[in-house]
Amino acid sequence: MKYLILIILFSNAMWSQNLESHQWKDRILVVNADEKNRERAESQYLLLNKEQQKLIDRKIVLYKCIADTCMFYDWKNTPKMFKTDTTKQGFSIVLIGLDGGEKYKSNTVEKPDVFLNLIDTMPMRRQELRNRK
């Protein structure tokens, strides 16, 4: 069930498997937008891009999907583009935790601190911080 959201968001089997490969390694932000909401998706990306080091520190990767084109950002390597055969409706952003579960969902552009602060309250993040000391 926890992967159902991933499969729904990306029907392309190869990329669904790649999303599953993030479990226990990365937190995932998925920004979905139809063509009409392209500007909102780009605005969300620009806000996140300004916080790259904080995203890397929290193991956050981003899938930005507009219409049938997705970009994958891990903030360390060149972004990767791929096509999907699913049609997006409106605008949404979803945070998926290390365990593969949905942690946050919104239909509005959010400041990065919304995600960063939420992650900082999660037990696994707290453990990561304790282990650094």
Predicted features along the sequence, with ranges:
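Non-catalytic interaction/Regulatory regions outside core domains
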Residues: K2, N12-K133
